[in-house]
């Protein structure tokens, strides 16, 4: 049967500020169709997959945490993923709760490594049922977390990130809360509460958060994902994109397998490359300091601007941002070097080239290798509108 869109009203308006108060939380913020499951069997007994055109679906998500292991200590069979970007990215290794939504209710189940994830594994009755299609937002991440504890997903799978990028490639954000906000019945207040609690208490490990807050946050994630799917999935037929979407899902599963297998690293070569690039970077940095006449933070636009002015560079040659800060990107430095014979500008470009190669392709790959000598990069399927794929965390060569 066709899915009828939810008539529940939105729980939060954009921009509303929420904070977690344990004394009033349940009274003010409880959601009657959100539950913490006491056992896997409770979910199995109560879940009735929602249907679209006779096809059965459920939505799932995982909440995860990092182990204390360094990347080169990660054992075979466990693939580390990362949350966030750049240097602020946090490693994630194992799930501590799994949430499932059937369009009417959402359940969150907790389990631990000490219990050998025996309760989670009982959910195989759902995850390994090929007649039930499984939906997630950033499916590969959650699939890795499940396989890290020897759980498998069988049957067709769906990713609302890929789905929503096909239905509208010009969205300003593909975060779940931002996509779901346009649909009646969305619930995003718990994410704001979680962020506020994280900032106030300086806690990054979600296992340390109040249980009721995590449960509602996790249940809201699968509920919002459900809303996005039932509203956006029909658009594939409307826009003539269903065949393309199905191809993208097959590709996603293949990319997941490639991530899982990993890329073997020549450790001897990487170690030699790391040493050579470190020497080139250090020499380039020393040459900059020698011409500047002092040591400064080469990566600081403000400090670099001051050095350029002290060396006699005309202030009018250095453009500003809209906020008035000096710009010292490669285009500005190339112009100073080629058109105005500013020799230190070329030295800075050389330093940046070697430093990027060092941190990205030598240190990044060498330091993130697993115990079996492989790197398990994240293959980005939807980052570029041109269709080009890339591999990050650690960065590897661009994929055609």
Predicted stretch roles:
Residues 2-106, 171, 183-186, 195-400:
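Conserved "right-hand" nucleotidyltransferase catalytic core of DNA-directed polymerases
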Residues 59, 131-139:
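Acidic beta-strand-to-loop metal/phosphate-binding motif
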Residues 64-66, 140, 162:
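Short, glycine/acidic-enriched loop or turn micro-motifs at the edges of active sites
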Residues 102-134:
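Nucleic-acid-processing active sites and adjacent nucleic-acid-binding tracks
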Residues 117-120, 173-177, 222:
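Amphipathic alpha-helical transducer elements in NTP-driven molecular machines
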Residues 141-148, 307:
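Phosphate- and divalent-cation-binding pockets in alpha/beta enzyme and binding domains
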Residues 142-145, 175-179:
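Alpha-helical scaffold elements adjacent to nucleotide-binding pockets in ATP/GTP-utilizing enzyme cores
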Residues 152-169, 176-178:
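Conserved beta-strand -> loop -> alpha-helix junction used to position metal-binding or nucleic-acid-contacting
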């Amino acid at each position: 049967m066709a899915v009828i869109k939810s008539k529940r009203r939105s729980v939060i308006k954009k921009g509303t500020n929420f904070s977690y108060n344990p004394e009033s939380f349940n009274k003010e913020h409880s959601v009657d169709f959100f539950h913490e499951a006491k056992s896997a069997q409770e979910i199995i007994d109560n879940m009735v997959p929602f249907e679209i055109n006779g096809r059965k679906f459920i939505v799932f998500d995982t909440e995860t945490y990092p182990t204390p292991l360094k990347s080169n200590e990660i054992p075979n069979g466990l693939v580390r993923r990362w949350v966030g970007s750049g240097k602020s990215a946090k490693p994630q290794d194992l799930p501590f709760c799994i949430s499932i939504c059937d369009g009417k209710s959402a359940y969150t189940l907790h389990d631990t490594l000490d219990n050998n994830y025996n309760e989670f594994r009982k959910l195989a009755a759902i995850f390994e049922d090929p007649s039930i299609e499984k939906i997630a937002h950033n499916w590969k991440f959650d699939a890795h977390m499940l396989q890290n504890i020897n759980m498998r997903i069988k049957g067709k799978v769906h990713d609302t990130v890929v789905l929503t990028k096909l239905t509208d490639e010009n969205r300003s954000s593909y975060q779940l809360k931002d996509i779901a906000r346009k649909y009646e019945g969305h619930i995003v207040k718990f994410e704001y509460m979680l962020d506020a609690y994280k900032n106030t208490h300086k806690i990054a490990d979600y296992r340390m958060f109040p249980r009721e807050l995590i449960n509602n946050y996790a249940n809201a994630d699968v509920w919002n994902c459900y809303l996005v799917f039932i509203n956006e999935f029909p658009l594939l037929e409307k826009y003539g994109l269903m065949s393309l979407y199905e191809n993208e899902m097959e590709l996603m599963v293949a990319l997941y397998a490639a991530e899982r297998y990993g890329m073997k690293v020549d450790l001897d070569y990487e170690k030699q490359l790391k040493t050579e690039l470190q020497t080139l970077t250090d020499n380039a940095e020393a040459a900059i300091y020698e011409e500047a006449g002092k040591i400064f933070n080469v990566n600081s636009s403000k400090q670099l601007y001051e050095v350029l002015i002290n060396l006699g560079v005309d202030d009018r040659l250095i453009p500003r941002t809209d906020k008035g800060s000096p710009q010292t990107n490669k285009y500005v430095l190339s112009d100073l070097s080629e058109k105005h014979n500013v020799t230190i500008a070329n030295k800075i470009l050389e330093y940046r080239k070697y430093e990027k190669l060092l941190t990205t392709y030598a240190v990044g790959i060498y330091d993130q290798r697993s115990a079996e000598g492989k790197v398990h990069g994240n293959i980005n399927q939807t980052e570029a509108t041109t269709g080009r794929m890339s591999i990050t965390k650690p960065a590897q060569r661009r994929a055609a």
